[in-house]
Amino acid sequence: MLPSIRVGLGTDVHPIEAGRPCWLLCLLFDDADGCAGHSDGDVAAHALCDALLSAAGMGDIGEVFGTGLPQWRGVSGADMLRHVHSMMTAEGLRVGNAAVQVIGNRPKIGPRRAEAQRVLSGILGAPVSVSATTTDGLGLTGRGEGLAAIATALVVGDEGKG
């Protein structure tokens, strides 16, 4: 039987909230303010969740972790990814690989890129690449008002799964 191969895309954007811890890529960055949100505000983890859910045909992050679901209030991006991964494996699906790009001025990702890739790959049991870019001062990320992330994921399962 041939494997079923699916690709998903996810995005997330949050405003920055002064004084809030900055969780990004499942890492705590002490040198920047974090993002507002129902959870920890980790836009990279959220974009990855959306990409995985999309590829798996399991809806989206709002469906699974919606603000109307109090049990997910304050949840970490790492725990969200673990939950999505668990949902997928229960359906016979696995992550082939994933990529996430953070869009914003701060925090600087480069010095912790390898660490982020190790953490994310460990959670998902597959290679995860991390990149970052700025918007050259344009838009809410360029003005430092928020952070955004875009992610892709390749999901593999038995034929007919997902």
UniProtKB/Swiss-Prot annotation:
It is an enzyme of class 4 (lyase). InterPro entries: MECDP_synthase (IPR003526), MECDP_synthase_CS (IPR020555), MECDP_synthase_sf (IPR036571). The record marks H38, T134 as: Transition state stabilizer. Keywords: Isoprene biosynthesis, Lyase, Metal-binding. GO terms for molecular function: 2-C-methyl-D-erythritol 2,4-cyclodiphosphate synthase activity; metal ion binding. It holds the Pfam family YgbB. 4-CDP-2-C-methyl-D-erythritol 2-phosphate binds at D12, V13, H14, H38, S39, D60, I61, G62, T133, T134, T135, D136, R143. It catalyses: 4-CDP-2-C-methyl-D-erythritol 2-phosphate = 2-C-methyl-D-erythritol 2,4-cyclic diphosphate + CMP. The keyword Lyase applies. It comes from the Bacteria. Pathway: Isoprenoid biosynthesis; isopentenyl diphosphate biosynthesis via DXP pathway; isopentenyl diphosphate from 1-deoxy-D-xylulose 5-phosphate: step 4/6. Its cofactor is a divalent metal cation. One of its GO terms (biological process) is isopentenyl diphosphate biosynthetic process, methylerythritol 4-phosphate pathway. Binds 1 divalent metal cation per subunit. Its EC number is 4.6.1.12. The keyword Metal-binding applies. A divalent metal cation binds at D12, H14, H46. Belongs to the IspF family. HAMAP family: IspF (MF_00107). Homotrimer. Involved in the biosynthesis of isopentenyl diphosphate (IPP) and dimethylallyl diphosphate (DMAPP), two major building blocks of isoprenoid compounds. Catalyzes the conversion of 4-diphosphocytidyl-2-C-methyl-D-erythritol 2-phosphate (CDP-ME2P) to 2-C-methyl-D-erythritol 2,4-cyclodiphosphate (ME-CPP) with a corresponding release of cytidine 5-monophosphate (CMP). This is 2-C-methyl-D-erythritol 2,4-cyclodiphosphate synthase. The gene is ispF.
